Amino acid sequence: MTFLLNIMLMSSTSQNVAMPYAELPGQCIQLTGDLVEVVYYYPNGSIKQIGFLENGNKTGEWVSYNLEGQIVVKAYFENNLKEGKWKVYNDEGELQYKIQYRNGKKVWAQEYDESGNTTAFNYK
């Protein structure tokens, strides 16, 4: 998933922002220095995604939710590059994939069935 956000924060208060890629409302809260927490919402008001920007780049954990509030992706970024272990869940909250990234490139991926058994493993 690629999410774009061009925001310049002038104060340490929270503010509402428009998300141009999806026209969904969002909120930015400056935490410390250049670290900003970003929260995106579905039109019904439920949280769609939470993550962090540092100097305008994605950093740390980003969590995406479905309309029912179930986690569908736990992702990690470092300086706007995919990094570390990502987990992808189905709408029932069951783990479907684990994907390992290093410097923005996929290192390996593991797929799971409904019972949690590994069904595929891909190493690059």
PLM features per residue range, with description:
Residues F3-K124:
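Glycine/tyrosine- and acidic-biased, solvent-exposed loop/turn segments at the edges of beta-strands
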